[in-house]
């Protein structure tokens, strides 16, 4: 899988960490360039490990071993502050539109790679709305969860 590297400054450096979850987000923006700019902004103080464009280009912004700032105040079961235990994937989408086929295809490929590498169970592939239900809605009602879970 081809992954393009781009620079991001919003993360905490770690030598090693336990990755238990993958958190899926939408950018809330239709424009890939603006989404990347926001994720790179030192003022915004947000980031993700990966971003997938509408055409299916995969970008890595933060190395997996480091903590990206994507989950915010979050909880799943007894685990809190999920930035520490997760990989964040941003998908360029406003949240009000269907997700393009090429984008979902590349997301599936990335999920398979990460799940295998870190031994992440399907039940631990979550949406931002799962871990912060009172604050977040992404990846939203148009996200194809059923197809994703069946194909991983």
Regions found by a protein language model. Give the residues of each.
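N-terminal catalytic cores of peptidoglycan-degrading enzymes
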Residues: 1-80
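Short coil-to-beta-strand
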Residues: 80-88
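Basic/polar, cationic surfaces and motifs that engage anionic cell-wall
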Residues: 85, 94-152
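Short loop/turn segments at strand-loop or loop-helix junctions that form parts
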Residues: 90-92
């Amino acid at each position: 899988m081809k992954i393009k590297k781009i620079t991001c400054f919003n993360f905490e450096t770690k030598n090693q960490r336990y990755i238990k979850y993958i958190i899926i987000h939408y950018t809330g923006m239709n424009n890939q360039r603006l989404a990347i700019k926001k994720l790179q902004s030192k003022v915004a103080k947000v980031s993700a490990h990966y971003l997938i464009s509408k055409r299916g280009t995969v970008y890595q912004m933060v190395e997996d071993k480091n903590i990206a700032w994507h989950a915010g105040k979050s909880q799943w079961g007894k685990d809190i502050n999920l930035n520490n235990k997760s990989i964040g994937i941003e998908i360029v989408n406003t949240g009000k539109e269907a997700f393009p086929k090429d984008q979902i295809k590349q997301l599936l490929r990335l999920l398979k790679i990460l799940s295998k590498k870190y031994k992440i169970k399907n039940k631990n592939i979550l949406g931002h709305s799962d871990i912060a239900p009172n604050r977040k809605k992404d990846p939203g009602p148009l996200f194809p969860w059923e197809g994703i879970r069946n194909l991983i």
